[in-house]
From Swiss-Prot:
It comes from Eremothecium gossypii (strain ATCC 10895 / CBS 109.51 / FGSC 9923 / NRRL Y-1056) (Yeast). GO terms for cellular component: cytoplasm. Residues 91-94 are annotated as: G3. PANTHER family: TRANSLATION FACTOR. GTP binds at residues 14-21, 91-95, 153-156. InterPro entries: EFTu-like_2, G_TR_CS, GTP-eEF1A_C, P-loop_NTPase, T_Tr_GTP-bd_dom, TRAFAC_GTPase_members, Transl_B-barrel_sf, Transl_elong_EF1A/Init_IF2_C. Its main location: cytoplasm. The keyword GTP-binding applies. Keywords: Cytoplasm, Elongation factor, GTP-binding, Methylation, Nucleotide-binding, Protein biosynthesis. GO terms for molecular function: GTP binding; GTPase activity; translation elongation factor activity. Pfam families: GTP-eEF1A_C (PF22594), GTP_EFTU (PF00009), GTP_EFTU_D2 (PF03144). This is Elongation factor 1-alpha. The modification N6,N6-dimethyllysine is found at residues 3, 316.
């Protein structure tokens, strides 16, 4: 077997008709987790429905339909392999809650793949002012997805024309530069998702195409296909050296064992014997054991979904949205208030001080008041445009002071990224996204269990 491949998460963004499903479907189909039986079943259904052209989008449509009906699909279906990586496709936009998922994300993307439709008229529509493409790319950048790959799709529809390709590369470079990416670090790859051309094997339809190139700290990296571009993602650094932050997804009471909180380690490590504090309540206790997939662990590291058993704490004292940390190393605390840069996406009216929508931050889901609108900024550069604006509307970026309606635990994005980004939800949609700059923490002490006191004396 050799060493486990590194896991990377990618998010696929782009305009509705850019061919995201077909392209993703193709990678999963050729390199991925869909077993032959499932594919044969899909192919048979496709043929019966007269969708003989089947082509990979059908795979993805099936998966999506199942997911939207709330059938949890075997997530293995959304995975594929490159020589270096296990790749998980987090979520393709178009899905209603895409923005929310990307922020509270069960997993942060290491790289975004922007799919641009090269067809005549299509490219222009996808990248126009109101385009979703702009919003998705801006979101990815704002939320700290620092690596980008651009795939220029549907090259078959323009007969692999070189000048059309160059024109799109030029326009797209300007576009991603405005969002904040440096085009020199971004591979541009011409593909046809429908025909599977230049996805896994180099195309033979474009004698002019010499391959993509990107700059990295280690020097220039070159390749031809989309799969090679994904394989050339720089390996993500997982934050094991930071203090522990583990937002709880659920808390179970298990007969004979006791209270078992469950969640994903975002930063740091959790080990048996550790004395942990839960914020915002401040309850401090000892971790008896840590397990994942019913196996005992010596330690849980970032990315692990773990369950852990705690002593002398009842299910009533801790809940989903609480954050677990090491009581001796920068323990998490309740936030009295916090300042954040907010980008208003789609709010029909004006937002003024006093507005109290629900914020989704890690696993917490709590109403927070826009207490003060401190300053309005340029979305791209962050430069200040005006002090104390009276209101904000769609498209604005601003620094805002928030006050939670009940105790919650959040962190500055620079300290603990997964706990420092949030979605603002109202009217059943994401109206804004935010990145937390600073937090005023509460110093109220909470309950310390006997187990914690004993462990502390050891």
């Amino acid at each position: 077997m050799g060493k486990e491949k590194t896991h990377v998460n990618v998010v696929v963004i782009g305009h509705v008709d850019s061919g995201k499903s077909t392209t993703t479907g193709h990678l999963i189909y050729k390199c991925g987790g869909i077993d032959k039986r499932t594919i044969e079943k899909f192919e048979k259904e496709a043929a019966e429905l007269g969708k003989g052209s089947f082509k990979y989008a059908w795979v993805l449509d099936k998966l999506k339909a199942e997911r939207e009906r709330g059938i949890t699909i075997d997530i293995a279906l959304w995975k594929f392999e490159t020589p270096k990586y296990h790749v998980t496709v987090i979520d393709a936009p178009g899905h209603r809650d895409f923005i929310k998922n990307m922020i509270t994300g069960t997993s942060q993307a290491d790289c975004a793949i922007l799919i641009i439709a090269g067809g005549v008229g299509e490219f222009e529509a996808g990248i126009s002012k109101d385009g979703q493409t702009r919003e998705h790319a801006l979101l990815a950048y704002t939320l700290g997805v620092k690596q980008l790959i651009v795939a220029i799709n549907k090259m078959d529809s323009v007969k692999w024309d070189e000048s059309r390709y160059q024109e799109i590369v030029k326009e797209t470079s300007n576009f991603i530069k405005k969002v904040g990416y440096n085009p020199k670090t971004v591979p541009f790859v011409p593909i046809s998702g429908w025909n599977g051309d230049n996805m896994i094997e180099a195309t033979t339809n474009a004698p002019w195409y010499k391959g993509w190139e990107k700059e990295t700290k280690a020097g220039a990296v070159k390749g031809k296909t989309l799969l090679e571009a994904i394989d050339a993602i720089e390996p993500p650094v997982r934050p094991t050296d930071k203090a522990l932050r583990l937002p709880l997804q659920d808390v179970y009471k298990i007969g004979g064992i006791g209270t078992v909180p469950v969640g994903r380690v975002e930063t740091g490590v959790i080990k048996p014997g550790m004395v942990v504090t839960f914020a915002p309540s401040g309850v401090t206790t000892e971790v008896k054991s840590v397990e994942m997939h019913h196996e005992q662990l010596e330690e849980g590291v970032p990315g692990d979904n773990v369950g852990f058993n705690v002593k002398n704490v009842s299910v009533k004292e801790i809940r989903r949205g609480n954050v677990c940390g090491d009581s001796k190393n920068d323990p998490p605390k309740a936030a009295e208030s916090f300042n954040a840069t907010v980008i208003v996406l789609n709010h029909p009216g004006q937002i003024s001080a006093g507005y109290s929508p629900v914020l989704d931050c890690h696993t917490a889901h709590i109403a927070c008041k826009f207490d003060e609108l401190l300053e309005k900024n340029d979305r791209r550069t962050g430069k200040k445009l005006e002090d104390s604006p009276k209101f904000l509307k769609a498209g604005d970026a601003a620094m805002v002071k928030f006050v939670p309606s009940k105790p919650m635990c959040v962190e500055a994005f620079t300290d603990y990224p997964p706990l420092g980004r949030f979605a603002v939800r109202d009217m059943r949609q994401t109206v804004a996204v935010g990145v937390i700059k600073s937090v005023v923490k509460s110093d109220k002490a909470g309950k310390v269990t006997k187990a914690a006191q004993k462990a502390g004396k050891k």
